[in-house]
């Protein structure tokens, strides 16, 4: 019989499909198993409606057979099968799906889920095969038919000899090449692992005869050398029932923990398990996990976020990044949905309304679980925060604060009050009477923040100080701007304003009286500071650095640490303590030794920078200046 040409621009489509659509050749097995499952679904559904088959779910199966000698991989099902016309229509026209037609005809009825919404999955077999033979017999038909093809040239359909309804697909696996080791698809271990990965939750048993060995009876004992014999045993490769579809009462915490550790390669139990399912505009089940600790590569560019995505129990994407916002990228888990729109390959999802709906609901669910943990299990939440708090704070700052309102109440900060982190709400709730701002300081550690000269004035007032020790912290607070109408105030910014009206008046008078001194020091530090002024925030320290404008000293350090970026310098102000003995020395130098005043100004400036955590440009020069006045 002459070969028939494929329809629907077959050569172009098949070439595109084999070489472009699928990025991993191994998914051919997933596609063929899904097709077999669809065929069984159709027969089961027909029997359910018409009561004609006399078959129950227990009667159905999918079988895989491997033959290394003939280099064939065979997949057999006892599903609905196909007539000659169905073989011609479904396999002769690329991108036509019998499953899609069946689904459309029955979409208003309650019944089984049909996976294969596009008729291209079958042709993925040609990625690994030099020839494909399909033997099929429709349920209730008296004759069988065989469809066979070697690829782009075309196909032929001839009478077949298959007994019993169903379909048998035999692939002749290609020879190995320089880059492709096709023989892997003839190895039982490799094939069983692919089934486990992609098709573990197909609802029908996927069986394969496994070659095994055992100790020969009468050997290995009484001084006899052990001898082994080979035997074959048929095994079911898939678990069939997804753990996320089982009732909560049927699943123990231990089961979920073990599933997580096996599935996501963690040696620790998860910190939190989140189970959720929704019906309606987007129907899905999700099983999510918050790890106990961050992966080694979590805060690197190499880390890939995403949830496993299943369509009716079939894995179609290992890491679907679109299901998680960046702020919750630490979450691991999976989503299973019947409603996702698939494009021509199950590997590449259309960014459609369904996916966005699911992602939005998952985001709210995760945020709700974190809030619940914060309120009801503070110790566990603080454990979570140690691993992933940085990501939440990045989430507040990211995208110009798009998610700041959803995340601000999840944030924790260390403070001057004890060794436990506090929320912004807790800080505001215990603010002192008359306190109008939320005060914070920045440094490499809590101890460094508390040692800042300006912190003394806050302690004297009894005000709590938030201690920001991560690079992103101040950027996050700048995006928030305020919390419960209380503005955030960096204690190292100019104009801390902790003085009484009487103290302010005295400061004005002192500034006027020592105007010449301040101008001389400002000239001595020209190009380094914008201004030298008297401070009302210093107690025991002689001087400190404050900043004016949008860029603080801490932000300057962070921005300048980034590669390939133009250097930025904050507008610095040197503030002097008029009540410190050093100030009297400065006043004397201004009158008696103006040239020495420049040296003192540079030393005070360098000292203030060091206290603020800023590295000196020339430490050796600073040390020499310091020694010269000792």
Language-model features: where?
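GHKL/Bergerat-fold ATPase module in large chromosome/replication-associated machines
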Residues: 114, 135-154, 174-630
